[in-house]
Amino acid sequence: MIVDLSHVLQTGIQIYPGDPEVEIKEALNVEKDFVNVLTVNMGSQSGTHVVSPFHVFADGKKLSEVELSHFVGTGVVIDATGLSDRQEIPTDRFVSTDVNGASIALVRTDWSQYFGSDKYLAHPFPNIESLEYLKSKGITTIALDFLSLDRTPGAGEDFTLANHYFWSQGDGIIGENFTNLKAISVARPHISMLPLNLGASDGAPVRAIASW
């Protein structure tokens, strides 16, 4: 069984506020040019993507410097469903989950159902204590079915990257904008989230899948 965990990359897809817009258009077509080719303009963190430590640390590892083992491995789904707008995910959602034997934690909130809407910006988010727990259990990569590892600020709220700073220490990898985590029906799926091999990159889109 193979389950696609990726949003379709297309013109106008929702991005983090302030990031470059995604534009995909025809460059060549078979009727005039014998072949179909697209022009793709987008930021490095568009759609379903991974984030390297270089995103938040000037001396952090760039994506092409990260071991490929961080992008494939045994996954475990953490159930963080049923939460409210901008709610901090309770720590017990993490510590009550058996993550032994996994290297990739997938945090399921089902917030991906709001992708493309303003409500998607009001996603839940973890706290440092929960991230510390995952690291203590050997999790190297965390993947989310929402916009950002940190709270995306609403009007009048302060901007923070505290969770990014913490997780990105020690080569931690973040996956954002995953979808369809509810379709994973086994305890330990194999996860693949290999990024484009962009040199000197802070991140890149992925075609993420779960299989078993």
Feature-to-residue mapping (PLM):
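Active-/binding-site microenvironments in catalytic and ligand-binding cores
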Residues: M1-W212
